[in-house]
Amino acid sequence: MIVQLKNIINDIWKRDKMSLVDTSWLENNINKVKIIDCSWHMPQTQRNGFEEYTKEHIPNAIFFDLDKNSKLDTDLPHMLTDPKSWEKIMSNMGIENNDEIVIYDNSDVISSCRCWYNLIYYGHDPKLVHVLDGGLKKWKKENKTTDDKKVITKTSKYFS
């Protein structure tokens, strides 16, 4: 029984191991990937992910607004938008279908995983979409470089 469980866990690890990347991997590949900051905070925290992003983010990171980039005509928060809207959002962010992407957040609500799910749902290759283990908190704890520069992106053509 324990051997079977270990084999199942190993199979899952082999299949999905690139979904989570560590800070050293990102630091070594920072100019080879697109980086998305998807920080979102519960309203009662009175924190604003975008304001925090403008003050400090991982170099080259593009901000993804989880509120604005979700379906807006519903009372339920953060519902998936329609495919055409998703294509426009990604295209405006300069994301292309073959881009390797690392997503992180600066929150305790794992909003980066929501963005990861959206990308996979709309057809981005799961092997090209990663979540940064520990997010911005771990990045800063390890004294890695942060930035406050506005990232300028070229519009791309993204297809879902």
Specify the residue positions occupied by each region the protein language model found:
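A general structural signal for stabilizing positions within well-ordered secondary structure
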Residues: 52-55, 121
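Aromatic- and Gly/Pro-rich amphipathic surface segment
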Residues: 54-93
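Conserved beta-strand scaffold positions in the cores of enzyme catalytic domains, especially
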Residues: 35, 61-63, 129-131
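Structural recognition of the beta-strand scaffold that forms the well-ordered cores
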Residues: 36-37, 63-65, 102-103
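Thiolate-centered catalytic microenvironments shared by cysteine-dependent enzyme domains
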Residues: 77-160
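Flexible, polar/low-complexity N-terminal or interdomain linker segments that lie immediately upstream
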Residues: 2-50, 137-160
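Anionic group-transfer/hydrolysis microenvironments
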Residues: 39, 67, 107
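Short active-site-adjacent helix-start/loop capping segments
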Residues: 43-46, 70-73, 109-113
